[in-house]
Amino acid sequence: TKASVGFKAGVKDYKLTYYTPDYVTKDTDILAAFRVTPQPGVPPEEAGAAVAAESSTGTWTTVWTDGLTSLDRYKGRCYNIEPVAGEEHQYICYVAYPLDLFEEGSVTNMFTSIVGNVFGFKALRALRLEDLRIPPAYSKTFQGPPHGIQVERDKLNKYGRPLLGCTIKPKLGLSAKNYGRAVYECLRGGLDFTKDDENVNSQPFMRWRDRFLFCAERIYKSQAETGEIKGHYLNATAGTCEEMIKRAVFARELGVPIVMHDYLTGGFTANTSLAHYCRDNGLLLHIHRAMHAVIDRQKNHGIHFRVLAKALRMSGGDHIHAGTVVGKLEGERDITLGFVDLLRDDFIEKDRSRGIYFTQDWVSLPGVLPVASGGIHVWHMPALTEIFGDDSVLQFGGGTLGHPWGNAPGAVANRVALEACVQARNEGRDLAREGNEIIREASKWSPELAAACEVWKAIKFEFPAMDTL
């Protein structure tokens, strides 16, 4: 539209401009699938168009400055609407965004555009971003994970099995020296990693520098004793980006292999800065998803975790927590495995049964190791080994430290259980069917495992999953 044609003031329906069912998506478009619940009386076409408009070029009334640009080139378009099976008044609205709307290499800008404003929109009862298709033309502007799965295995010299971790508990209140002691016991017993809890930053009872020093000392001691490379996820999350980088620099100076960040509370800008620092300086980066359930738990409103996982792969992280399917925290099997594949694989085919709305081609962006953590113990080991496969980190906090004989025997029990499951799988046994039997056999020659089996034989966290398709 040329400005000289004359400008028609007034409010017009979004669907006249932003609902384009004939649109053929381009390879360079960012595609979004929104679950839209319109207010009563609002047709789905208008609701879908409103989402496209408010997350791209639109505003509530016609403005004369529209004539100074080409809306056809820059507007988001709602190009398809499907009713959600089994839900009344819910629709999946597909929106295509031209690539030029987004700053290169900025997850922050991508989210500000796509979900920044539109979720408070009055014509909608609720809105959830279910999935995004990131075109290679955009993903190529990101560094992505500092190292990725293969480089991490090479750095650690550990192959052919999942990695084992443990969150140090009690998460708050230990002194730095006692904290280091707990780290040492776990690593000496056979774990690959121990972890700062997500809310351990730098509190009065344990300042960050003291913790880093005591943990580094204990990492070296356990490495010398076991002959294996060990790590502790030193949480560098801080109140400012400068302080965060300062902590990462200190970790690098200590020569430890890995640091950690809470990427949602810390923010994507901080996370991307830290990921760049980690690649430049050879540090692995463990990512915790603290605050994710605030955003992703409601079925009809918010952002699904698979979108937050894709965003993390772009922003950068080598590990990310991804639910367990079997422990105390949320995670439905097919859906969880859907976003686990989105984290690890180069190419993921569209598969609605697993919640994957678009085919995603990551080209050569490094992969991220999914971390299973939360309420898991030795009896879960066969299921975890089968569900997550080799490229994963299995993290037992209480499942290590809660062992009746202490941390090191708890670590031994987990390592023995894992090695038994991997060996059984490699021999062609069915972990799903024979899992309990495999653990029982192994416990005959490992008193530590036998004691762990006894303590947790009846523990289950069985609630119906919230995250259904």
Curated annotation (Swiss-Prot):
Entries under PROSITE patterns matching the protein: RUBISCO_LARGE (PS00157)
User: What are the subcellular locations of this protein?
Assistant: Plastid, Chloroplast
> Which cofactors is this protein said to need?
Mg(2+)
Q: What is its EC number?
A: 4.1.1.39
Positions of the record's site feature: Transition state stabilizer:
328
Pfam families xref list = RuBisCO_large (PF00016), RuBisCO_large_N (PF02788)
Q: Which GO terms describe its molecular function?
A: magnesium ion binding; monooxygenase activity; ribulose-bisphosphate carboxylase activity
Q: Which residues carry this modification: N6,N6,N6-trimethyllysine?
A: 8
Which residue positions are annotated as catalytic? 169 (proton acceptor), 288 (proton acceptor)
Q: Per its record, how is this protein called by name?
A: Ribulose bisphosphate carboxylase large chain
| Source organism of the structure | Coleonema pulchellum (Confetti bush)
